[in-house]
């Protein structure tokens, strides 16, 4: 399994992306953060999966782990001692969506960390503004689908245990049939998102 995860991450790093997208996995630290997260999950057998839209520039764009900013990574996954990399441990990056998602995960109080991924695993941004987020286009989502399918296969997550966080993720998961939808926490969706995760 470790070899499959290694190959998966190497494939991410080798993906050629467009001029309005950042391949965050060109960075060795983000690759290692993702590897540590996926290996920890494999050992602890996740019981459900959350699929979002794409990495945000304050969250996954910094850590390499979906729905996870540096603050949540330190609080719930590991510290530098465990091998996780932080750009500045004295001033941790925070993202609203990451805080909401992790808050709901902890509120479930089941001791389980879900497998988390995105419809498109690279960071799409607006023209002339790298520190921004952009909805992935159709071509990008086609690229993203192969990574999503591979990760689902690696972890053998049953269809009924996969949840779409947001409409982009719901559309991307359409090939599986009807998938449970959870509202994305951005743009006023916090309460509905939390309720959705708690109801899993």
Model-assigned labels for residue ranges:
Residues 177-200:
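Short, flexible loop segments at boundaries between secondary-structure elements
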């Amino acid at each position: 399994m470790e070899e499959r995860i290694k190959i998966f991450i190497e494939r991410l790093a080798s993906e050629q992306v467009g001029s309005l997208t950042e391949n965050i996995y060109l960075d060795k630290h983000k690759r290692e953060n993702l590897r540590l997260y996926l290996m920890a999950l494999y050992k602890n057998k996740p019981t459900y999966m959350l699929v979002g839209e794409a990495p945000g520039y304050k969250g996954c764009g910094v850590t390499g782990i979906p729905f996870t900013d540096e603050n949540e990574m330190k609080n719930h996954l590991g510290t530098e001692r465990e091998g996780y990399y932080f750009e500045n441990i004295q001033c941790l990056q925070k993202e609203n969506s990451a805080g909401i998602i992790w808050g709901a995960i902890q509120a479930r109080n089941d001791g389980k960390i879900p497998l988390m991924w995105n419809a498109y695993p690279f960071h799409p941004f607006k023209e002339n503004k790298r520190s921004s987020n952009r909805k992935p286009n159709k071509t990008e989502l086609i690229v993203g689908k192969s990574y999503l399918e591979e990760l689902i296969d690696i972890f053998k997550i049953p269809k009924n245990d996969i949840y779409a966080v947001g409409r982009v993720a719901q559309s991307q998961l359409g090939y599986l049939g009807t998938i449970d939808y959870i509202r994305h926490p951005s743009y006023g969706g916090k309460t509905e998102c939390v309720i959705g995760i708690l109801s899993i």
